[in-house]
Design a protein with these regions (language model features):
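Short, solvent-exposed loop/beta-turn-alpha elements that line the ligand-binding surface or hinge
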Residues: 108-115
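A structural micro-motif
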Residues: 16-18, 25-26, 78, 105, ...
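Acidic/His-rich segments in extracytoplasmic proteins that coordinate ligands and/or metal ions
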Residues: 1-49, 117-159
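Short, conserved clusters of charged catalytic residues that mark active-site
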Residues: 58, 65-67, 116-119, 152
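Basic- and aromatic-lined ligand-binding clefts that recognize polyanionic substrates
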Residues: 53-105, 176
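Extracytoplasmic metal-acquisition and chelation regions
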Residues: 22-50, 88-101, 165-180
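Short hydrophobic segments within beta-strands
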Residues: 81-83, 135, 171
Length: 180
């Protein structure tokens, strides 16, 4: 999203503007997939543009096969609240709710393909999550652990079940959730 990543329009302005020495005929390929399917489609398009269609198809086929294996795993009723930011609170969006579903869980806030957005304390409380995933965009595991600790001190939400059951998890966002 444009909160933590440079927008494609900003990139185009810089690359085709006076700040850059690239010729104005340079083709800019913007990738903005918001779901597993869209990301796979964009990989194939990129393969076409780079004359690497065979390699792109191999990567997509491998990803689809891996995903299909996950579909056979048990499904759980647990709701996971994934937070891409904690001040203000941002819900996870784009492909993250789909990742949660593929793993066999339910997204407490956010649906496949929706943009990340600011969420209120009330929405967090109403979502009644079983678990909270701290996946602050652009941060590694050790930094997200610090954010999770800070979250535990937030009196507006630290009475929720995940805090009582110690079901607050931190992840390396760049490795698993940020732009692929």
């Amino acid at each position: 999203c444009d909160v933590c990543a440079i927008s494609s329009s900003e990139i185009e302005v810089v690359l085709k503007g006076t700040l850059c020495t690239l010729p104005s005929s340079t083709q800019i390929i913007s990738l903005n997939g918001k779901s597993f399917e869209e990301i796979c489609s964009e990989i194939l398009k990129l393969g076409e543009q780079l004359d690497a269609e065979k390699e792109a198809k191999q990567h997509v086929d491998k990803a689809i096969a891996r995903r299909n294996k996950l579909d056979s795993l048990p499904k759980y009723s647990r709701k996971i609240l994934s937070l891409e930011w904690i001040d203000p609170f941002f819900s996870a969006g784009h492909w993250v709710p789909e990742q949660i579903e593929i793993a066999g869980f339910r997204s407490a806030i956010g649906q496949k393909g929706e943009h990340s957005r600011v969420i209120s304390i009330e929405e967090i409380i109403e979502s009644d999550p079983d678990d909270i995933a701290v996946i602050c965009c652009g941060y590694k595991l050790h930094e997200n652990k610090l954010f999770a600790e800070k979250l535990k001190n937030n009196k507006e939400i630290n009475f929720l079940r995940p805090f009582k059951t110690d079901n607050i998890y931190s992840f390396d966002s760049d490795a698993y959730f940020s732009r692929p």
